[in-house]
Amino acid sequence: MAQAKKGGTAAKKGQKTRRREKKNVPHGAAHIKSTFNNTIVSITDPQGNVIAWASSGHVGFKGSRKSTPFAAQLAAENAARKAQEHGVKKVDVFVKGPGSGRETAIRSLQAAGLEVGTISDVTPQPHNGCRPPKRRRV
């Protein structure tokens, strides 16, 4: 007869779970990746380590509602709130992608209480690299 396994937890015995420590980072960088389907906001320290992040899907939107400017606004506010718990007061913004939530996310970072320094567009431009997807015919 097969022995019945006892239900275990996600953390195994003897394995340490990583405790999230509060960092004190006054100046950081906000990376906003806005695609046609989603918007992801990551706030990092000057070395590039992620302090806080949020996305339209993480905030609770599904499907085509993730690509709306309102979803990007809520994601940016959520990420800014988490970053302020770590002491972030000023951010430089790096925006990437062609999505609709770019400007809204920057505005909501300011409205959430973060001081925005520089705004840079770091959208990758191909030097005739991969073939783009075919045109939509609706």
UniProtKB/Swiss-Prot annotation:
Alphabetized Pfam families for the sequence: Ribosomal_S11
This protein's GO CC annotations: ribonucleoprotein complex; ribosome
GO molecular function terms attached to this record: rRNA binding; structural constituent of ribosome
Sorted UniProt keywords: Ribonucleoprotein, Ribosomal protein, RNA-binding, rRNA-binding
Region spans: Disordered: 1-32, 119-138
Any one Gene Ontology BP term: translation
Protein role: Located on the platform of the 30S subunit, it bridges several disparate RNA helices of the 16S rRNA. Forms part of the Shine-Dalgarno cleft in the 70S ribosome.
Protein name: Small ribosomal subunit protein uS11
Annotated source species: Mycolicibacterium smegmatis (strain ATCC 700084 / mc(2)155) (Mycobacterium smegmatis)
